[in-house]
């Protein structure tokens, strides 16, 4: 019992030390390094990542005028990332809260997402995007996972509300994504993993 108490005290002290270290992290420098690394990796994949600057915010950093171009083009006025220390320790994997303002995705025609965000948990076998939300012409609510080795959707349960002008595009996307239509302008991205197996 005495050994358990000592171990618990040590864990509390360690958690306090990490929290203090986290509070004084030079987030602007961390963000600048992370974005430079991301831009380099995107370039090797045939994509271009540009931004105008990085600022520190409480618990993370914010990137201004972000554009990611390739097969499609994603742009937003600002992208804010706040890594979660305690959540990462609990999940034994990196966890980060992501939010953006005035986001849009161009894929044939622009999709205006407005403001939104999600929480991402990145494990070696699965990247989870939960709490997906947007408030623009294209509204998304739900979650999905990506299998890094296959770069395919593993599990998903997300509602998508789209304007009438984009319905034809959704029908096309239906050939590549697990989309189900449930009324005018209302779609669901759904995929469940078979028990003990891999999602199809």
Predicted regions and their residues:
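Extended lipid/amphipathic-ligand handling interfaces
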Residues: 51-56, 68, 76-91, 115-126, ...
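Non-cytosolic head/periplasmic domains of membrane-anchored proteins
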Residues: 94-160
């Amino acid at each position: 019992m005495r050994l358990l108490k000592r171990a618990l005290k040590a864990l509390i002290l360690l958690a306090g030390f990490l929290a203090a270290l986290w509070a004084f992290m030079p987030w602007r420098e961390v963000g600048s390094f992370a974005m430079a690394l991301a831009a380099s990796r995107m370039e090797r994949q045939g994509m271009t990542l540009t931004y105008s600057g990085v600022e520190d915010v409480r618990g993370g950093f914010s990137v201004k005028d972000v554009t990611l171009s390739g097969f499609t083009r994603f742009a937003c006025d600002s992208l804010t990332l706040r890594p979660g220390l305690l959540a990462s320790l609990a999940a034994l994997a990196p966890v980060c809260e992501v939010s953006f303002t005035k986001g849009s995705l161009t894929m044939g025609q622009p999709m205006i997402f407005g403001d939104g965000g999600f929480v991402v948990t990145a494990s070696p076998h699965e990247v989870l995007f939960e709490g997906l939300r947007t408030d623009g012409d294209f509204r998304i609510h739900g979650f999905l996972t990506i299998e890094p080795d296959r770069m395919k959707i593993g599990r998903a349960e997300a509602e998508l509300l789209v304007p009438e002008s984009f319905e034809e595009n959704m029908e096309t996307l239906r050939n590549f994504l697990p989309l189900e239509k449930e009324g005018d302008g209302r779609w669901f991205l759904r995929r469940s993993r078979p028990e003990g197996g891999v999602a199809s």
